[in-house]
């Protein structure tokens, strides 16, 4: 029963934070530290597995759009082919950096102190970018210039540091490069598909010994909760940022990071 409750809580945290610019990894690490949830080899793998629930939410929400791209890709449509190439270009930097420095980053930087500091710094950056008087030139996430896709992919590599936020890094980069807020957020969703599936495949292979059929029920609970939560959050998030920007999420990061530092300093 306790494991099922853990799965529900972690599924909610994952589903709520995965596509918001607040760092799902950071929130999951802090949840494990301060509430004693998700600690241990199995739970490390569990957190990666339930990310697929969040990815499924994106596939469901954007099914029609992605299906058109898939059909266009095989029928020779230039725009569809260009978009797929763009996503692959944006995805490749994370593959390269992950293979070269992934083990070092995980062993040296995956701790709550780093998370809290990066939450605060990332919040300040997000607040700064949101206040800039940018003049967007790109309004369709499927039609960014190819070089723009590359720079977004390079920026996404910063999110390997826990607390930075994959979506936050890609959204900030896209906005600075000329995308409007909605297009920037949508491309971060699309880029998440290969990035998170790749991370899942690598982590699952590496930790496959930790996963048994005994864990199937717990993983299913986390997967379903993550899927439903992400489905609700993504719909709400896009409408909200289009109207109000990212100030709320910036301050959320700063507050959570500050409270985390205070708690750590007090010995929690």
Go through each PLM region and give its residues.
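Multi-pass membrane proteins that catalyze or facilitate reactions on polyprenyl-/lipid-phosphate substrates
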Residues: 1-268
